[in-house]
Curated annotation (Swiss-Prot):
Listed name of the protein: Small ribosomal subunit protein uS3B
SUPFAM superfamilies reported in the protein's UniProt record: Prokaryotic type KH domain (KH-domain type II), Ribosomal protein S3 C-terminal domain
Phylogenetic lineage: Eukaryota, Metazoa, Chordata, Craniata, Vertebrata
EC supergroup of this enzyme: lyase
Gene3D superfamilies: 3.30.300.20, Ribosomal protein S3, C-terminal domain
Name of the gene this protein is made from: rps3-b
Native organism: Xenopus laevis
Length: 246
């Protein structure tokens, strides 16, 4: 008999599972453009969709690597044999994924590229991909012994309110260089997309859409309208008049 679990414990257990799975995949697939994970639970099995920019590297030669990852996940989280399946899905718009861009910037800095040049390259690529705005912050020992932070901003960026939850994609990464650890923070403001493919379907609260007026048909000849006759209204009852007495 399966043990009963309260709703509160179920939500906590699901959150811990997804966080631990995300941390494991981030560590394993960092060089393959790992950009997130989706978990879909069906009655028969659990489907784990890995979002990455280089899906061929995630799959490996003849699917060997994805099978190894499936075996590790199955053993670590105690799934029954054949009840968990891993899939690799390519990120549709790499320039609008904050995790992919943070990893890209991380490898540029590891390769010895200057901070300013690397950040402006990422900024330009994000804006060319159709983002409404972006912000890149790099902090740490950038030049001297004193730690400082450099911020690079382009376009529009919102910082407060409910739309931040679904319009702004954020990612934080750390890179270990010779002089110390640098922190990387990338924020991308997604565009409004009614189809929901590259951005949220819901428009911003302050978005004003102007509807084009319909073309009026100007009559060329005089016309007359035949209106239907009004139905006879019932007459109000006549009140009896008081009779004057002598």
């Amino acid at each position: 008999m399966a043990a009963q679990m309260s709703k509160k414990r179920k939500f906590v257990a699901d959150g811990i599972f997804k966080a631990e799975l995300n941390e494991f995949l981030t560590r394993e697939l960092a060089e393959d453009g790992y950009s997130g994970v989706e978990v879909r639970v069906t009655p028969t099995q659990t489907e784990i969709i890995i979002l990455a920019t280089r899906t061929q590297n995630v799959l490996g030669e003849k699917g060997r690597r994805i099978r190894e990852l499936t075996a590790v996940v199955q053993k670590r989280f105690g799934f029954p044999e054949g009840s968990v399946e891993l899939y690799a899905e390519k990120v549709a718009t790499r320039g609008l994924c904050a995790i992919a861009q943070a990893e890209s910037l991380r490898y540029k800095l590891l390769g010895g590229l200057a901070v300013r040049r690397a950040c402006y390259g990422v900024l330009r690529f994000i804006m060319e991909s159709g983002a409404k705005g972006c912000e890149v912050v790099v902090s740490g020992k950038l030049r001297g012994q004193r730690a400082k932070s450099m911020k690079f901003v382009d376009g529009l960026m919102i910082h407060s309110g409910d739309p931040v939850n679904y319009y702004v994609d954020t990612a934080v990464r750390h890179v270990l260089l010779r002089q110390g650890v640098l922190g990387i923070k990338v924020k991308i403001m997604l565009p409004w997309d009614p189809s929901g493919k590259i951005g949220p379907k819901k428009p911003l609260p302050d978005h004003v859409s102007i509807v084009e007026p319909k073309d009026e048909i100007v009559p060329t000849t005089p016309i007359s309208e035949q209106k239907g006759a009004k139905p006879d209204q019932p007459q109000p009852p006549v009140m009896p008049q008081p009779v004057a007495t002598a």
